[in-house]
Amino acid sequence: MQFSDPATVLIITILAVTIAFTAVSLYTAFGPPSKQLADPFEEHED
């Protein structure tokens, strides 16, 4: 498999960006930064 093929480089780049975005999203949602997230339903007064 050659990595010099433009299509292969594009696919690997798209996969890397997608995996990185998913990892950061999961870390933000469930990791230590999730304590800083506000819940709008709990803050809303009826």
UniProtKB/Swiss-Prot annotation:
GO biological process: photosynthesis
Annotated keywords: Membrane, Thylakoid, Transmembrane, Transmembrane helix
Location(s), subcellular: Cellular thylakoid membrane
Membrane disposition: Single-pass membrane protein
UniProt keyword Transmembrane helix, yes or no: yes
InterPro entries per UniProt: PSII_PsbN (IPR003398)
Pfam families the UniProt entry points to: PsbN
A cellular-component GO term for this protein: plasma membrane-derived thylakoid membrane
Domain of life where this protein originates: Bacteria
Segments passing through the bilayer: 10-30
Family per record: Belongs to the PsbN family.
Summary of the function given for this chain in its UniProt record: May play a role in photosystem I and II biogenesis.
Record HAMAP family: PSII_PsbN
Protein name: Protein PsbN
